[in-house]
Structure formats: C-alpha cells, structure tokens
C-alpha cells in the first residue's frame, strides 16, 4: 500500500508564501493572495513559539478579506521547543482552537487555519511524565528535543501551525518583563469569567476529557 504523503505545513518565514496563503484561504474567501509582507512580533526569550504578523494583498477588494493574520509556529530555539513539546503546549493550543474556541467563554481570535503532524512518538508521553517528576525543567527541555530527534523513522520534528485573526488594536504585554497592574486586572477579569462558566460544570468536564483523550 503506498505511503500517504504528509501535508505541507510551513514552519519558517520563507515558506509563508502568497501561494500557500491562497491554498489555505481561497475556499473560505473566494479570493487569492497576491503578496505577503511578514513581520516577526514574537520570538526568542520568553516565547515557546514564533509569532508572525502577515499583511496580505488580495486580488479583490472586499471588506470581509482580512488585511493581516497572525501565524504561530513552534520555536526554533531547542530549549524552548523542548519545553513546548514536553508540556504538549503546541498540540493543546491547536486542539483548543479547533475544538473548543466556542466553548471556552474566553475572547479568542478567529481561527482561519490550523494543522499539525500526527504524533510520531505516542510512547514519549510516559517518558516525559517521568522526566518532569525527577528532573528540573531545563533538563526536561533538552532531553525532550533529543528524544524527538531520535524517535521514529523520520528524524524531523513534529510540525504545528496556527493561522488566526490579527487583533490589530491589541497590545500584548512583555512575556519577560511582565505587564502593568491594569494588564493584570484585565487578564484576571477574563479568567474569572472563564472560571465562573466552567466551575462544577459536567459539560466542562466532558470538554476537558475530550482534549485529554485527543492528546493520548
């Protein structure tokens, strides 16, 4: 039986081309992307992933066409990548947008496109649980990257990608320096609404079980 070809999931700036955006968005919007202007807005210290703002030029002029979108992919820094994989942060975020965005009771950007490879190392979960129990986080990050490189027939790291709405008037606080008191009040207000919605909710337990089941 012929092997199924893996989907194309770009991970680097040079791969986010107009043709790729058209492939992802043309069916949704009935228009093609002609050009892309990329801006890195999050990478390096304090970031588990890399975040790009992509300004799109379309072959049509309509109010419903997004003028920019946000792309999120895993970090290229081994320690950050290892931590993200070890805690399943990339997979959880993709699944949350795909399956739970309407049920979270949190303001979330609109999802335009999401993709990730199948898990090539499902056995690794138990190993990572053991490492997190007995090793410091930095050691777990390094060990996770090494396991991922050695696991399976394909040494390439698992790919993840999110394309979401660009909230152009949003101001994300620094993940290193932290935010202001006003930022904390806004964040805690949103968390309070989330907590109130899901507290002692049997439906919410089902949502949690669904996500955990997809991660196993």
Model-derived regions: residue spans:
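Juxta-kinase regulatory segment immediately upstream of eukaryotic protein kinase catalytic domains
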Residues: 1-40
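Conserved ATP-binding subdomain of kinase catalytic cores across diverse folds
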Residues: 41-216
């Amino acid at each position: 039986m012929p092997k199924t070809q893996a989907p194309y999931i770009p991970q680097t700036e040079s791969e986010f081309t107009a043709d790729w955006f058209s492939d992802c968005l043309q069916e949704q919007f009935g228009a093609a992307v002609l050009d892309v202007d990329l801006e890195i807005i999050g990478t390096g210290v304090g970031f588990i992933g890399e975040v790009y703002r992509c300004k799109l030029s379309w072959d049509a002029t309509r109010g419903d066409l997004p003028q920019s979108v946000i792309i999120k992919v895993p970090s290229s820094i081994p320690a950050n990548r290892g931590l993200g994989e070890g805690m399943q942060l990339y997979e959880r975020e993709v699944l949350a947008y795909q399956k739970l965005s309407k049920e979270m009771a949190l303001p979330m950007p609109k999802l335009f496109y999401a993709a990730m490879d199948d898990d090539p190392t499902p056995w690794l979960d138990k190993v990572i649980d053991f490492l997190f129990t007995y090793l410091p986080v930095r050691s777990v990050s390094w060990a996770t990257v090494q396991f991922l490189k050695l696991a399976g027939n394909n040494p390439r790291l698992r790919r993840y990608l999110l394309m979401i709405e660009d909230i152009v008037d949003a101001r994300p606080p620094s993940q290193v320096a932290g935010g202001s008191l006003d930022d904390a009040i806004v964040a805690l207000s949103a968390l309070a609404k989330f907590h109130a919605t899901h507290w002692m909710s049997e439906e919410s337990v089902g949502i949690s079980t669904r996500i955990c089941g997809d991660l196993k």
